[in-house]
A protein has these predicted regions:
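Short, structured coil segments at secondary-structure junctions
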Residues: 48-50, 118
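Short acidic-glycine loop/turn motifs at beta-strand connectors
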Residues: 22-27, 130, 142-145
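Metal-coordinating catalytic core of metallo-dependent amide/deamination hydrolases
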Residues: 44, 137-154
């Protein structure tokens, strides 16, 4: 698969106004600036030879996914009010037995918001009002099953 024509921003700080990314087997194989100033339709034709899928990213910024290092996404649910709030357990000041993985609702609208904002993974934890609030879980943000979203669950 090729992503072409967008503004490519790399982790190393390189920026190409008209760049391309080659992805094979889910991994970035190659990336760089498009040589010359060929119009995107001509590039699509060039890159789409064979079985290559081509995404025209003209007018878009293409960059690595962002990581949310600390949040309560899916625990303090958007639009649910108190019924969807599993964030803070107020019965004790120390609650190390709480596990975020048990409270996260991957159907929460916050997951869709995160994906649209470029956040590809997040460290989600229980409340912030307790001295010890429980254990966090590190998840991908795209998907609907918590079991499939988990990257690391201590």
């Amino acid at each position: 698969m090729y992503i072409i024509g967008g503004k490519i921003v790399t982790m190393e700080g390189d920026v190409w106004e008209n760049g391309y990314i080659c992805i094979e087997n889910g991994k970035i194989k190659e990336l760089g600036p498009v040589e010359g100033k060929a119009p995107v339709p001509a590039l699509v034709e060039k890159f789409s030879s064979g079985k290559n899928e081509v995404i025209d990213a003209s007018g878009c910024i293409v960059m690595p996914g962002l990581i949310e290092a600390h949040c309560h996404m899916g625990i303090t649910e958007e639009k649910k009010g108190m019924e969807g709030d599993d964030c803070n357990e107020t019965v004790e000041p120390i609650t190390p037995y709480l596990r975020a993985v048990d409270a996260v609702n991957p159907m929460d609208a916050a997951f869709d918001d995160a994906v649209r904002a470029g956040i590809t993974s997040a460290m989600i934890g229980p409340g912030s009002s307790n001295v010890v609030g429980g254990s966090f879980v590190f998840v991908k943000t795209h998907g609907r099953s918590i079991d499939r979203l988990i990257v690391k669950n201590p």
